[in-house]
Regions:
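DUTPase catalytic domain/fold
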Residues: 1-140
């Protein structure tokens, strides 16, 4: 049962976002046209998909695990409510790679946003187990 519908529109030659399984968190996004990715280069690949993210939600463009295994990095993208342009996906490849029109290149996950306001305060006075430990601080 669907609780909310998100309106989308496709440019000519674009592929409809799909889910392989109804329980999947994200919709697969597809390359609209063939693209040659050069080694150690970063490219913006157009999907030709427009979505109308409602107020109180955000669209996250996330990597596909199969691309990560192929040495293709996809940084997270954010689609704010009100943006109506075509979704593009940033891809970086370790080696030369051809992406064909119709290849799945990322996934779109739409999530609700809590209403939060940022207030200034003394963060360092807050004691926690983690503290200032960041990258690699857990020893793994």
């Amino acid at each position: 049962m669907f609780k909310r519908s998100i309106v989308y529109q496709l440019d000519a030659g674009a592929y409809k976002p799909t889910k392989a399984h109804s329980s999947d968190a994200g919709y697969d996004l597809y390359a609209r046209e063939d693209v040659e990715l050069g080694a150690d280069k970063t490219f913006k690949v157009d999907t030709g998909v427009h979505v109308l993210i409602p107020d109180g939600y955000v669209g996250l463009v996330l990597p596909r695990s199969s691309f990560n295994c192929m040495g293709v990095a996809t940084p997270t993208g954010v689609i704010d409510a009100g943006y109506t342009g075509s979704i593009s996906v940033v891809l970086s490849a370790k080696s030369d790679l051809k992406i064909y029109a119709g290849n799945r290149i990322a996934q779109l996950v739409i999530v609700p946003l809590p209403e939060i306001r940022l207030v200034e305060g003394d963060v360092m006075a807050h004691k926690s187990e983690r503290g200032c430990g960041g990258f690699g601080s857990s020893g793994r």
